[in-house]
Each structure stands twice: as C-alpha cells, then as structure tokens.
C-alpha cells in the first residue's frame, strides 16, 4: 500500500449492526472509493450494498458490493466486526472463546487471499481479538490495530463536556487499558482547551470529586446501559471506526486511542494489545504515544494488562489456537 494511492479500498468482514453502521458512516463521510462487504449471510450483504449505493447521488462515487475473501488481496484496509454479539449480562471477556474461533477462520482466509494491507479489529473482546489477529496473520504488529479505547475516550470527552458546558472537541482526555471493565481514566492529563481539568474545575466549580467518580463509572458502564435498553451498541463505534479509517487512508499521522501492541512502553506491560494513544497513518501504527502515568494510573494499566494477558495465555495454551499462531 502507498500513502499516495488515490483509489482506497476497504473490505468489511461482518455485516451485523456494527458493520452495517460503519459502512453507512463510510458512505456519508465520503471515505474510500471502494467498499466490499463480507458476511456469511450473502443476501444481507447484497441488500446492504444496494441500499448504500442509493445514497451515492448525495455523497460521492464509490464502488459498493457484496465481497468474497478473494477480494481482500488488493485492499488497503480490512475491518473485522464479525463475531458473536455481547448479550445482556455478558461481559466482553465472556465472548473470548467463541469469537477466537470465528477470528481464526476469518483471518486465515484473508491472509490466504494475498492481503498485504492493515487489519482494523472491532469485534469484542477487541484487545484479545486484535492480539489473536496478529498471531493468526503473522503480520507485523504495526499493521494490526484494534479500535481499543477510541469509543471509551469519546464517551469520556462527551460526558465531561456535557458536565462543564463546553464542546466535546475542546475536551482532551483519554481512557486507557482494556476496552472493558478494567479500563481507567487518565485524569492526570485531562484538560479543557489546554487548562488542566482539576484547575478548570477549581476555577469553575462545575463538578465535585464524587461527581467525577460517578462520571467515569457511567462512561465505563455505558455499553451495559445501552445493551440493556436496545440490545447492542453500534452507532458510536461505527463512527469511531470511520475516524480511524480516515486517519489510515489519508495518512494523517493522527493521535488516536487504539489497541496497540505492548513491548515495555509501560513497566510490567508486555506481549498484549491494550488501549493507549498512538500515531496512526497509511502504514498502520507509526509509534505509540506514551503518556506519563502517575503511580495509581500505572497500577491500573498493569492490572488491566495482567487480566488480558491471563486470558490470552489460557486461550493460546489450547492446541486449536496455538497451532494456528504465526507470530
């Protein structure tokens, strides 16, 4: 793939609620010139491709079609949303084994097509499935990316913005760690238009310390709330994926919170994918952005990574997954 290439091709694997919402976001935001959609329900992908194509007169030209794995061979980006959905009362980590099997089958077929681009993983549990995509593909770690805490960070910024009465785009704050129950807020570096969050709150008295705790809990548990109300989350993550896609296809070198391979960026955190900011462009992860964490935040990062690593190690101790690993 070249950063100057004008015809950008995306293959989406998984045409469920997240996948179809992502496809819609690509069309409405004029991202990419070609979109192929793969799903086991071929007729559904044909219907979605036809339906989406009817929006092109209002947006920009794009080739949209129901694809096969062979179509991945010259894609710039393959986006993986295929997987069993998270059910009410089920954590993202409960999904591990069934979605690892799906991931192994999908990634094996994509690699067999001759695909040389970038993997973007969104299926849950995303940090573990990003790791397994890296293992099953044999690709360099920079070319396997997970959506990570991109949505969590967006929720965090929006919640803070609503609380203090500013535009969410003026709030700069990250959620790091697992995209899930062990994630944490990086309070030490949160700011509003360059003003440290604590300084802002001291001057404006918008919320007290307990209010911040409650705000974080609402962000962390947002998916459970939405799933209980409507069965699934898909709009927010779809737009987050579209943003990451644009950063890759346009070679933006944008800093986004993603699921990034760990090899000692943070003390005691290695051999796993986990959410942290990173520079991303046409060739994948350019480099991680290692925000200096305070002691409490570092402990949370380590605890989150240890939880993921334990699940990864247990999963890849099984022959069906260990035998398929290429990395």
From Swiss-Prot:
Binding site for substrate: 86, 92, 124-127, 152-155, 233
EC number: 1.1.1.27
Keyword Phosphoprotein applies: yes
Residues of the active site: 179
Keywords, alphabetical: Allosteric enzyme, Cytoplasm, NAD, Oxidoreductase, Phosphoprotein
Subcellular location: Cytoplasm
Root EC class: oxidoreductase
Family annotation (InterPro entries): L-lactate/malate_DH (IPR001557), L-lactate_DH (IPR011304), L-lactate_DH_AS (IPR018177), Lactate/malate_DH_C (IPR022383), Lactate/malate_DH_N (IPR001236), Lactate_DH/Glyco_Ohase_4_C (IPR015955), NAD(P)-bd_dom_sf (IPR036291)
Record: residues binding beta-D-fructose 1,6-bisphosphate: 157, 172
UniProt GO cellular component terms: cytoplasm
Annotated pathway: Fermentation; pyruvate fermentation to lactate; (S)-lactate from pyruvate: step 1/1
One GO BP annotation of this record: lactate metabolic process
Catalytic activity as recorded in UniProt: (S)-lactate + NAD(+) = pyruvate + NADH + H(+)
Domain of life: Bacteria
Free-text activity regulation comment from the record: Allosterically activated by fructose 1,6-bisphosphate (FBP).
GO MF annotation list: L-lactate dehydrogenase activity
Modified residues (Phosphotyrosine): 224
Pfam families membership: Ldh_1_C, Ldh_1_N
Residues annotated as binding NAD(+): 18, 39, 44, 69, 83-84, 122-124, 147
Main location: cytoplasm
Function in brief: Catalyzes the conversion of lactate to pyruvate.
Family statement drawn from the similarity comment of this UniProt entry: Belongs to the LDH/MDH superfamily. LDH family.
Quaternary structure note: Homotetramer.
Listed name of the protein: L-lactate dehydrogenase
Organism: Streptococcus equi subsp. zooepidemicus (strain MGCS10565)
Organism placement in taxonomy: Bacteria, Bacillati, Bacillota, Bacilli, Lactobacillales
Gene: ldh
């Amino acid at each position: 793939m070249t950063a100057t290439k004008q015809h950008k091709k995306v293959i989406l694997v998984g045409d469920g609620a997240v996948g179809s919402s992502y496809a819609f976001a690509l069309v409405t935001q004029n991202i990419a010139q070609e979109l192929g959609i793969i799903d086991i329900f071929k007729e559904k992908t044909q219907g979605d491709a036809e339906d989406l194509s009817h929006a092109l007169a209002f947006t920009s030209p794009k080739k949209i079609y129901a694809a096969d794995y062979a179509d991945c061979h010259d894609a710039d980006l393959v986006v993986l949303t295929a997987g069993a959905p998270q059910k009410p009362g089920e954590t993202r980590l409960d999904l591990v084994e069934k979605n690892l099997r799906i991931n192994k089958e999908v990634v094996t077929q994509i690699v067999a097509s001759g695909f040389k681009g970038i993997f973007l993983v969104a299926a849950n549990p995303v940090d573990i499935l990003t790791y397994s995509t890296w293992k099953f593909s044999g690709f360099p770690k920079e070319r396997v990316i997970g959506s990570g805490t991109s949505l969590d960070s967006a929720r965090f910024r929006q919640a803070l913005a609503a609380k203090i009465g500013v535009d969410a785009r003026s709030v700069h704050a990250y959620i790091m760690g697992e995209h899930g129950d062990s994630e944490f807020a990086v309070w030490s570096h949160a700011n509003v238009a360059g003003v440290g969050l604590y300084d802002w709150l001291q001057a404006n008295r918008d919320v007290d310390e307990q209010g911040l705790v409650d705000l974080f809990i609402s962000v962390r548990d947002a998916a459970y709330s939405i799933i209980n109300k409507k069965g699934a989350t898909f709009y927010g993550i779809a737009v987050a994926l579209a943003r990451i896609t644009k950063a890759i296809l346009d070679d933006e070198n944008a800093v986004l919170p993603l699921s990034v391979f760990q090899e000692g960026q943070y003390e005691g955190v290695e051999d796993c994918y986990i959410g942290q900011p990173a520079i991303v462009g046409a060739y994948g992860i350019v480099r991680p952005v290692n925000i200096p964490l305070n002691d409490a935040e570092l402990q949370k990062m380590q605890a989150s990574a240890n939880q993921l690593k334990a699940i990864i190690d247990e999963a890849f101790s099984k022959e069906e997954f260990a035998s398929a690993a290429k990395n």
